[in-house]
Amino acid sequence: MRRGVWWALVYLAAATVSLPPSHADSTLVFTAVAVDGDSAVGPMGRIYAGPQGVMTLGGQGAQSIADAQEVARRLNALAEEGLRPSDITVRRERRDWTILAGSQRIVQIDKSLAKIHSTDPKRLAKTWAGNLSTAFGRPYLSVRPIVVPVGETRAAPIKGNIVGPVSVLTEAAYVGASYDAKKKAVRVVGYDVGHTELVISDDRSSLRVPVRSAKYAARLIGPEAAGVTGNPAPADTIRRAVEATVAAQLQLEPGAWASISARVESIPPLRPGSFATVPVHVSASGQDYLPYRQSPVVTVHNEAVPMAPVDVLMVSNSPERLMSHGLWFEGSLKDYRSARLLYHHVNSTGVPSDLVIEAVNLGDRAGRLHLIAGKGGPSRDEAYAGHKGAREFLGNRAAGIGWTAPVPSGQAVPVFVQHITPGATASGILEIRALSPGDFSLRCYLSPPRSSWLPYRLKSYSPSPFLGRWHYPQPRLEVDASYVVGREWAFVSIGDQAIAGIEAGDKLAGNYGVIYDIALELSNPTAEPATVEILMEPGGGMARGTVIVDGRFVETSLLRRDSESSVAQYALAPGEVRTVTIQTMPQGGSNYPVRLVARPK
């Protein structure tokens, strides 16, 4: 390889990194063509500015043509940026001479490269630089292709050497365009979606510039504050509230997709009556849409929501094994202000899936729901999945930990999503309260997994065949019991008396999802101290339990026939009488009924 050509290639590669890419349209166009050299030099690459040759690279055979094409590409990039002739300079670097455009190297010339042209490096550098200055000094126009959002305006500078007045013509009604003489820019407003061209002309040149008018993939309206409850509300609940609020404010275009991420890592648990501000990252994209990026800051309040017993229990468990994707449960809140939904399903589709609980607003006004939730799984141990879901729900319910979710009119809002691996069980409980009157429907369906679940507008609605099934009003039972030291043991059955559903003949065997509030009176009429133990024992098959005893959570291990688990012990002084408050709930995946037993220790 000849030394001069080697230096040229080195600096061509360096310039490729630093020069701007070629994306604009220009009436000054550089091209590279192959020309014949003598037998010693071989093929050469000549660069033209329009019809005028400006430089010729040679000495390396076919590679010289490729090098010339690369130089032409970078000169076009400079033309598109409106390079001034005065920016073309030459500089000596030891024995060689370099042509620069501003601070960017175009080519470096040494004796070997100059010898091909029968001259020296300095003269060749000045000749080529003069050719480039002449080319960049001629009248020309350069404008980058324009992308304008519908309903917005964008300005694109006209670069180059303008001669005389400028006119701008549009070829379609999608956009409007005008020339800003003061800023030497064309201003374009997007009216509708479409692709067209602008014809930009001065006294010497005419240029066709592509224009695209497009919608953003989404738009964020608002802002609106988010709401949580709990003493305190933890970070994960704050995240749910903020993301649900932002999702309801995000107007997503058909076919677009989006992600919402609330940054709660540095947010401490939120006490009742307090508030915090949470940064959120929103991004949306889609085919034929403009990418949308926003970083709003959302205020979240820990507000007071009355926690009255719910009106109805809804159970999604038939069938327990879901063999296909689709809708498997629907319940209406039209006649209720609150509901508790228990779901317990096995993913038998053979593929990973998402179990989705969504709220549908069938009314003509926006509404808000308050949710308290607990989920278990995915797990191949269905008793463990049900136990974990019940434990999490009862814990959140006891502390009032929940969030509010806006539900815009005519939209379906995924309020709770659980991923299920093949063969695994998902089990959970949601307590839902309507904070404003409305016609809400709750639906449970299995779906292929998605990276994010967002509200969507209903194109139409028709009730599912499941609507109104497996509904059980007043899902709370109060039980009074007593145990007297020295007398017979006390037994409290949990799940033995099935509550009735709204459909004739429907009974909820096991009372899964029903809250039991038990007042157990313990008395010691003897003259001696006594210790009373409270235990849980299965009523038939294997079962687990979660019991809240005087505000203390107790979880049992997996109980089998003829086994038992201690729940609490109380030391009673002679003549002492005390009442123990117990709350529990039959949980999915276990065999209920079970029994609580009070007996002497």
Model-derived regions: residue spans:
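Extracytoplasmic soluble-region selector
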Residues: 135-220, 247, 256-264
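C-terminal functional regions that serve as terminal interaction/effector modules
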Residues: 273-275, 282-289, 522-601
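Asparagine-centered strand-capping/turn motif at beta-strand->loop junctions
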Residues: 345-353, 358-367, 371-373, 377, ...
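A short beta-strand micro-motif common to beta-rich folds, especially ectodomain repeats
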Residues: 192-204, 276-284, 428-430
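N-terminal targeting peptides and non-cytosolic leader segments immediately upstream
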Residues: 25-142, 149-152, 180-185
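Intrinsically disordered, low-complexity Pro/Gly/Ser/Thr-rich segments with frequent PxxP/GP/PP motifs
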Residues: 387-423, 551-581
